[in-house]
Structures are given as C-alpha cells and as structure tokens.
Amino acid sequence: MKKVLIVLSIEKPNAKKICKEIEAFLSAKGIDSFVYKYDGISHSPELNEDYDLAISLGGDGTVLFTARYSAPRHIPVFPINLGRFGFIANIEPKEWEGELLHLLNGKQALHKRMLLSASINRKNKEIVKYEALNDAVVSGSGIAKLINLDISFNGISFGVFRADGVIVSTPTGSTAYSAASGGPILDPDVSAFVLTPISPFSLSNRPLVLPSSGQMKIKILPARAKDIIVSIDGQEMVSLQEDDEIIISESPNKVKMAGCSPDNFYKALRSKLGWSGSSSPKLN
C-alpha cells in the first residue's frame, strides 16, 4: 500500500485530532496520505485516482459519499464512525489503529456491498446518472407532496402509485429511510431492491422486495405537487419534470468495505436498532 485517501468530515469536532493520528501512523509505515475535507455538501471531489485505500472519518453520510467516489475506482473503504448512529461505519474511534493494522497485514477481510444505478431520462435522453449505496428517493418537495408515479419492473406494470414518494433501497439502505417508512430489513448479501412507498394514498401499497437482476422504471405523471425531486443517498438531488423517467438497476460496481462482516451487521441490528428488543437476550 502506497497512498491513502482520508475523507474527513469537518462537522465532527474530534475528526481533526484522529486524522492527525492516522496520518502519523501511515507515515511511520512509509504510506503517503491525502486529506479531503468533506463539508456534507460537496458532490464530486476532483481527486487523483491512484489511492490504495479510502478512510472515511465521520458518520454514515461520510461513508456514503466516500463509497460513491471509491466504488467505480475499485478503492476499498475503511469506515471510522464519528457519528451518533454509525450503522454503516462500524469501526469505532478507539478501534481504528488495531483494525487498520489488521488490514495492512492482510488480516482484515473486506466485504462487498452492492450499489444501485439511477438513470434520469428526459424526452428519451439520459440527462444524468448516479450510483447509490443506500437509496434513490422520488418525492414531492413542496407544500403539496402527493405525487403520481407509474412504476414497472422488467416491463411489467405495477400500476399508478399515489403517495408522497417512493424509496428504492439496496440491502445496505434497507436499514435507513426505507425501514423508517415500514420497509423490511435485508441481509447485505441478498441481491435485491426494496420498493417502499412513502405515505401511500392506498393502504394496499405495501413494500416490495424485488431481484436486483431486474430493471425498474418510475415515470412522473401529472400531480398536484409541482416540485418533484429524486434524491441519491440523501446527498445528490435532481429536479424532475412531468414524463421524466428514472431507470433503476444494479450497478456493475461494488464497494469493498472493512468492518462490515455479517456478524457486525447483526450486532448493529441489536445494539443500534434494538432488534429482538435486547442486545443481551436471556434464555431460560
């Protein structure tokens, strides 16, 4: 390993101190490092692409930003949690040195997480394309939020959804906005999407789990809401127009992450989401 990118969240008060410690640790091992200061707003950093590792130093939002940059460049991500929740960033500040040493010595396994691809088409032309580690959300952003969406999967129509919006999440994103909206939680190794309506007009519009090998199409229909957007991981946003189409499929890119083993996933479900009601169940 020769060069490491450190994505530093400037919003975290203790991030700079830990960043200096990481820089010194890497320097002592003959590894160069470059610090990118992430402000929570920037979208596409202009960085070189010759990094061997990207260290995310912040909360889950910093991990999402780092993952979207790293995945197409095949750069592994080492996520250190400085946030309040830290469901994706499972490496705690007190653990970073030991975990990073394990990684450098080849003793830390990397686990792949799938991303979704969201292509926005207008008048039969692609205007922009994004990748998301968590989700793509189509919603009304004004006072009138109810929108109408024509949704199909592999050419099969699901009909018209009347709702405040819909969430299309990856297994990683199934623990986030989708779960808060009543969607199921998926194991990260499951190859699937979750389609979750947001405050649907009809009670029969329930969440759906769909194979990631397929393609979903979401078409914007006339509605009361005039301000409609698609949000990528809650960080990238595009305004939509009537008849725009969002094409969602599995991205060919995957992000390799440290500290994201199946064991850590289920530990996080218990400790951070209160799954099963207790982190230390007692058996009679």
UniProtKB/Swiss-Prot annotation:
Positions annotated to bind NAD(+):
60-61, 134-135, 145, 162, 164, 235
GO CC annotation terms, alphabetical = cytoplasm
Q: What is its main location?
A: cytoplasm
Q: What class of enzyme is it?
A: transferase
Q: Which UniProt keywords apply?
A: ATP-binding, Cytoplasm, Kinase, NAD, NADP, Nucleotide-binding, Transferase
| Cell compartments where the protein resides | Cytoplasm
Q: Give a short account of what the protein does.
A: Involved in the regulation of the intracellular balance of NAD and NADP, and is a key enzyme in the biosynthesis of NADP. Catalyzes specifically the phosphorylation on 2'-hydroxyl of the adenosine moiety of NAD to yield NADP.
What is the name of the protein in this document?
NAD kinase
What is the protein's species of origin? Treponema denticola (strain ATCC 35405 / DSM 14222 / CIP 103919 / JCM 8153 / KCTC 15104)
